[in-house]
């Protein structure tokens, strides 16, 4: 009963917030809001600098590997149970996937900073 009440409350609250956000007026964006502000002076250069695609790909790769490594954090707590074979097998599979992914990125020159 408590679970049903909590889920109903979450659904009603999220629906209410979504409908309020939908019906609120949207702020107007005009040229002065979209331009960069540098202490009252005209901007010295364009605010839209070219972004290196290589940097973006290295950043995304780092983010993916970082999130996958975060899956390894609960292993010390999982090792306290009596059946550690399943934990060790899952850990070995996860580390193997990470190693294969790193080797794939390395062979495809995804970790090279210069082009």
UniProtKB/Swiss-Prot annotation:
- What gene does the UniProt entry assign to this protein? MT-ND3
Database matches in InterPro entries: NADH_UbQ/plastoQ_OxRdtase_su3 (IPR000440), NDAH_ubi_oxred_su3_sf (IPR038430)
Entry's Pfam families? Oxidored_q4 (PF00507)
Which named protein is this? Answer: NADH-ubiquinone oxidoreductase chain 3
Residue ranges that the Swiss-Prot or TrEMBL entry lists as coiled coil: none
Q: Which leading EC class covers this enzyme? A: translocase
Q: How does it sit in the membrane?
A: Multi-pass membrane protein
Q: What are its E.C. numbers?
A: 7.1.1.2
Q: How does it assemble?
A: Core subunit of respiratory chain NADH dehydrogenase (Complex I) which is composed of 45 different subunits. Interacts with TMEM186. Interacts with TMEM242.
Q: Which domain of life is it from?
A: Eukaryota
**What are this entry's molecular-function GO terms?**
NADH dehydrogenase (ubiquinone) activity
Q: Per its database record, what is this protein's job?
A: Core subunit of the mitochondrial membrane respiratory chain NADH dehydrogenase (Complex I) which catalyzes electron transfer from NADH through the respiratory chain, using ubiquinone as an electron acceptor. Essential for the catalytic activity of complex I.
Assigned keywords, A-Z: Electron transport, Membrane, Mitochondrion, Mitochondrion inner membrane, NAD, Respiratory chain, Translocase, Transmembrane, Transmembrane helix, Transport, Ubiquinone
In its UniProt entry, the species of origin is given as Oryzomys palustris
């Amino acid at each position: 009963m408590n679970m049903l009440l909590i889920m109903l409350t979450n659904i009603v609250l999220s629906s209410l917030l979504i409908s309020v956000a939908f019906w609120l007026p949207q702020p107007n964006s005009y040229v002065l809001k979209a331009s960069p502000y540098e202490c009252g002076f005209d901007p010295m250069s364009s605010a839209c600098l070219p972004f290196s695609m290589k940097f973006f790909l290295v950043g995304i790769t780092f983010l993916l590997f970082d999130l996958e490594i975060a899956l390894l954090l609960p292993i010390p707590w999982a090792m306290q149970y009596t059946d550690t074979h399943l934990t060790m097998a899952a850990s070995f599979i996860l580390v193997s996937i990470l190693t294969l992914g790193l080797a794939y990125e390395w062979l495809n020159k995804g970790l090279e900073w210069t082009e």
